[in-house]
Amino acid sequence: MKTGIKHILIILALMVPTACSDWLVLIPPQGLIREEFWQSKEDVEAVVMGAYQEFAAMDELLFKYGEIRADMVVGDVNQGNDDRKVAEGNIYSDNSLCNWNQFYTVIDYCNEVIKNAPEVKKVDNTFTDYAMNGYLSEVYWLRGLAYFYLVRVFGDVPYITEPTETD
């Protein structure tokens, strides 16, 4: 029994120093790393399209914020409790429809393009000033539209112009 414990302790003693190493690099599950992503005009276009897609996914939510609150839609017995709260003017945090996450995801995508598109232009010779300015114009407009809806629905909201720095 003592020799078995000795063997286990020796094996553990040999394994512990190799368990932690400086060469260990964690890669995000999505497989994309910020330093490797912003390399071409296609990367810029992908983020711009992602911002549009995220905004388009909010269509039902934007409808509810406008039409239900304006009394333009009549509920029925199948109307959810959160819809009823919006109709009553309850746009507080206890209502699951009143979530800023999608708006700020769009804003973050736009901020990423605003920050990184000029850097991509330096490394991608096919990325022209014309194309870059077109993408920048789109994301400035889209970010402004997101803030327009946020302010219209919720009033004062945080104004963020820098992208998040996480992978």
Regions found by a protein language model. Name each.
Residues 20-27, 79-83, 157:
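Short, compositionally biased low-complexity segments
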Residues 1-29:
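Bacterial Sec-dependent N-terminal signal peptides
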Residues 45, 53, 81-154:
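Conserved, well-structured interaction surfaces
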